[in-house]
Amino acid sequence: NATHSGEVTGSGALTIADNIVDEANLKVSNSPTNGYGLVARSGNTGGMTWEALGGGKILQVITSNDSSTRSTTSTSFVTASSLLSINITPSASSSKIFFIGSISLYQTNGNAFPEITIYRDSTDLSGGAGLGGFRAGDGNQNMVFTAISHLDSPSSTSQINYRIYIKSGSGDSVALQQNNNISTFTAFEIGA
């Protein structure tokens, strides 16, 4: 077996012995850092560099819940509950905020059509369309847990308030957490 130093080239298949290629033998443009990965980058010496493996990391999780009955007859979105509210300060402006929620909805009239949405400070993230609720009525009282999810890109590193809002489609009474059911609302900051 021949011993080589520097770059090795050949026109046919070359075999490298086991346990020979290590950090010292790689042609990389920078020094390694624990937790970093080796990434191909054209233009760098050797075409490789050590970089933080980004994207998709959960940076923080905040959960809120409420079990007190809250009701409204408003046909415009109003604050559903001061407890179904999350304050979050994104770590980077490129972060996304992903929400999931299980919201206990109740309508006193089967055709009240309660709707819920998420507000970022004063902005309705559904654009007024709502993110969940009763879409059909049967004339009876109804209670249901509505699952909601939404992905937001706030482009901010300042504290942001996200809150559940509710409205009645008909002006009849609608409620959250009727009979002390529990609603939950969770935010995940996802690194870019």
What is each PLM-predicted segment?
Residues 53-67:
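N-terminal leader/pro-regions and domain N-caps
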Residues 1-57, 92-93, 192:
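Extracellular repetitive beta-rich solenoid segments
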Residues 34, 80-82:
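Short, solvent-exposed loop/turn segments enriched in Ser/Thr/Gly
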Residues 84-86:
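Extended, low-complexity regulatory regions
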Residues 64-65, 71-76, 89-96, 100-159, ...:
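Terminal beta-strand-rich extracellular "head" domains
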